[in-house]
């Protein structure tokens, strides 16, 4: 019984992707594929927004939607599974009217509500943000250190990391601190992962010593 429901959702998502653009228009595929229910909704929205040249506008509106849904009062009325559907629809209608979202964003919200998928909204926003990040040529990079880096060291690190990027790519750097790594740093850039932490070095040394003994 579950398969037809999923199929129905997929059909509605595909319909959403073409309902606001001319019929039979070719689907614009996002620069990166995101799987799951959230990925299907985000892909349909990306295609529709791309055709209307409103990707940036929709991205801003989705971030606003995510922000609104985090508000306790809104979450209590919209995301609570025990609240009647009619009340959720009324709350969403009020929000849409107040924010004056574009038809693209409005259609997405209404479709999520209709399919009982409002709990997936944050995931859809995240998936769409990922697509937009790749669309802009951004390369995510996370650097974890035991203590905050000095400004000069951070500047030097950025220069080194940028040297690994291709032309047109943009470094999207996030620096975190985690005292448990004890020293050194852990770098994740794109699909690459390099662990130069003191903690890992100590673990490797400990393992090597045990093997010798």
From Swiss-Prot:
Position of the signal peptide: none
Entry comment on modification after translation: Acetylation at Lys-162 decreases ATP production. Deacetylated by SIRT3. In response to mitochondrial stress, the precursor protein is ubiquitinated by the SIFI complex in the cytoplasm before mitochondrial import, leading to its degradation. Within the SIFI complex, UBR4 initiates ubiquitin chain that are further elongated or branched by KCMF1.
Sequence motif SIFI-degron, location on chain: 5-23
InterPro entries in the cross-refs: ATP_synth_OSCP/delta_N_sf, ATPase_OSCP/d_CS, ATPase_OSCP/dsu
Transit peptide feature, positions: 1-23
A Gene Ontology BP annotation from the UniProt entry: proton motive force-driven mitochondrial ATP synthesis
Pfam family of the protein (one): OSCP
Alphabetically ordered keywords of this record: Acetylation, ATP synthesis, Hydrogen ion transport, Ion transport, Membrane, Mitochondrion, Mitochondrion inner membrane, Transit peptide, Transport, Ubl conjugation
Subcellular location: Mitochondrion; Mitochondrion inner membrane
Modified residues (N6-succinyllysine): 90, 158, 162, 199
Claim: Nucleotidyltransferase is one of the keywords in the record: no
Residues that span the membrane, as ranges: none
Residues with N6-acetyllysine modification: 54, 60, 70, 73, 158, 162, 172, 176, 192
Recorded superkingdom: Eukaryota
Predominant cellular place of this UniProt entry's protein: mitochondrion
Similarity section: Belongs to the ATPase delta chain family.
Quaternary structure note: Component of the ATP synthase complex composed at least of ATP5F1A/subunit alpha, ATP5F1B/subunit beta, ATP5MC1/subunit c (homooctomer), MT-ATP6/subunit a, MT-ATP8/subunit 8, ATP5ME/subunit e, ATP5MF/subunit f, ATP5MG/subunit g, ATP5MK/subunit k, ATP5MJ/subunit j, ATP5F1C/subunit gamma, ATP5F1D/subunit delta, ATP5F1E/subunit epsilon, ATP5PF/subunit F6, ATP5PB/subunit b, ATP5PD/subunit d, ATP5PO/subunit OSCP.
Function of the molecule: Subunit OSCP, of the mitochondrial membrane ATP synthase complex (F(1)F(0) ATP synthase or Complex V) that produces ATP from ADP in the presence of a proton gradient across the membrane which is generated by electron transport complexes of the respiratory chain. ATP synthase complex consist of a soluble F(1) head domain - the catalytic core - and a membrane F(1) domain - the membrane proton channel. These two domains are linked by a central stalk rotating inside the F(1) region and a stationary peripheral stalk.
Protein name: ATP synthase peripheral stalk subunit OSCP, mitochondrial
Record organism: Callithrix jacchus (White-tufted-ear marmoset)
């Amino acid at each position: 019984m579950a398969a037809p429901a999923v199929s129905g959702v997929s059909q509605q998502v595909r319909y959403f992707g073409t309902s606001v653009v001319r019929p039979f228009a070719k689907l614009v595929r996002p620069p990166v594929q995101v799987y799951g229910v959230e990925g299907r909704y985000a892909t349909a929205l990306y295609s529709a927004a791309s055709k209307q040249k409103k990707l940036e506008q929709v991205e801003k509106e989705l971030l606003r939607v995510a922000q609104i849904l985090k508000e306790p009062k809104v979450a209590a009325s919209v995301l609570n599974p025990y609240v009647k559907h009619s009340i959720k629809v009324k709350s969403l209608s009020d929000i849409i009217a107040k924010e004056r979202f574009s038809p693209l964003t409005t259609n997405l919200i209404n479709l999520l509500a209709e399919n009982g998928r409002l709990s997936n909204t944050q995931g859809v926003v995240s998936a769409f943000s990922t697509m937009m990040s790749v669309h802009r040529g951004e390369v995510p990079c996370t650097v974890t250190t035991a203590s905050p880096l000095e400004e000069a060291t951070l500047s030097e690190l950025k220069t080194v990391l940028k040297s690994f990027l291709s032309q047109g790519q943009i470094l999207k750097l996030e620096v975190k601190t985690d005292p448990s790594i004890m020293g050194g740093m852990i770098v994740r850039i794109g699909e690459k992962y390099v662990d130069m932490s003191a903690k890992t070095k100590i673990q490797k040394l400990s393992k090597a010593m045990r093997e010798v003994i």
